[in-house]
Structure formats: structure tokens, C-alpha cells
Amino acid sequence: MSDQGRLSLPRGEGGTDEPNPRHLCSYSKLEFHLPLPESMASVFACWGCGEYHVCDGSSECTLIETHEGVVCALTGNYMGPHFQPALRPWTEIRQDTQDQRDKWEPEQVQGLVKTVVNHLYHYFLNENVISGVSEALFDQEGALRPHIPALVSFVFPCCLMLFRGASSEKVVDVVLSLYIHVIISIYSQKTVYGALLFKSTRNKRYDAVAKRMRELWMSTLTTKC
């Protein structure tokens, strides 16, 4: 992604003398107290590096398909029905199940995605203290950044195959472990070992799902080196 602009950040609000060698941009919407043109109403800024992004569906947006529609992966901003994402995992999964007896109902899938998001929120808010992860997931008020639920939804079709012929409750636990593994591996600023990471080496099926989830998630990120 090319630079659209950069904000000067004061020390103590994300500005540093030395650049982070592995910075992943995380955008928040800029709030203005005066009426603005529509083009200025969708300006987001990364307070980690100062870059800003105009979220208007242009080529600078990273459009992804979620269970609720097309959003920009950089901001979580809903783009409406007229935009086409480059990757369409939800469309693909619907096409794959058209000729199958067991089809996924939209309400059922939506419920599963919300369950995963809620569990991830509580886990990373209460139990995870790994440097870099909390900052990437939560804003200054402790709420999930809007693009995180969108990314959870975006990669969820990778997990649907695990639910076939298995107890949903047990599979949700596995899926949560996979998400925790993927999120920590992407956002942690240091190498992490131990129980926090999903032990997938003995299960090639889970390992393949985790790899695909990570690839999809990483494909949406703006990385600064």
C-alpha cells in the first residue's frame, strides 16, 4: 500500500524517535467537531506510525468479504453492496456447499462468528499480556478495534470444515485455540512459546487450517519495516 499521508505524532501518543522494525498499522477514525465534506468524514489514522487512510473504497482500501458484507480490512468500515473484494472466502464456501446435504444457515454461521469474537475479546482482555498483541486488538478505551471482528469473520470459512460431523461445542474450543495461535503469531513483538500457542504439530488437519487462516489474515495487513 502506498503512503497516503503522515501525521506528526507527539511523544507519548505513538510517536517515537526510533521506528518499530515490525510495525503493523492499526487505524482509528479521526473525530472532528465541525461539519466536513463527505470525503473527509472517512479519514482514519494509525497512531503507531502517523499514516492516515481515507476509507472510501478506492484502491488504497483493502476490501474483504465478511459474513455481513464487504468491509475495509484496515478500518472495519462497511463499504456497501457495490464494492467487490479481491478475496471472497464466504462466496466460495457457499458455492462449495450448494450441492451438499448439510448447508450452513446464515444465522447459524453469524452466531458462531459472534461466539468466537466474544471469547477472543475476553481472553485477550483478561489473560493475555504479550507485548504488541493488546495494542493491536484494543483501542485506548479497551474496546476491540472495528477491523478485528471483520478479520475474524474474513478467515472463519477456513474453519467451517472442522464442524462437519463433530460437536459444535468441542470444535469451537479448537477454533478459538487456532485464532489465539494465529493472532499471537502475527501481532506478538517477541517469540512466544508454551501453552499460549496452539500445539498443532500432531494434527496436520488443524495445522493446515491455521496456516490458511494466517495467510488470509496477513494478506490484509499494512506492514511497515
From Swiss-Prot:
Pfam families: Herpes_UL92 (PF03048)
Keywords tagged on the record: Early protein
InterPro entries reported in the protein's UniProt record: Herpes_UL92
Record's keyword annotation contains Nucleus: no
Superkingdom as given in the UniProt entry: Viruses
Residue ranges of the region described as Disordered: 1-20
Family from the record: Belongs to the herpesviridae UL92 family.
Function: Part of the viral pre-initiation complex (vPIC) that is responsible for the expression of vPIC-dependent late genes. vPIC is composed of at least BcRF1 that binds the viral TATT box, BDLF3.5, BDLF4, BFRF2, BGLF3, BGLF4 and BVLF1.
Protein name (database record): Late gene expression regulator BDLF4
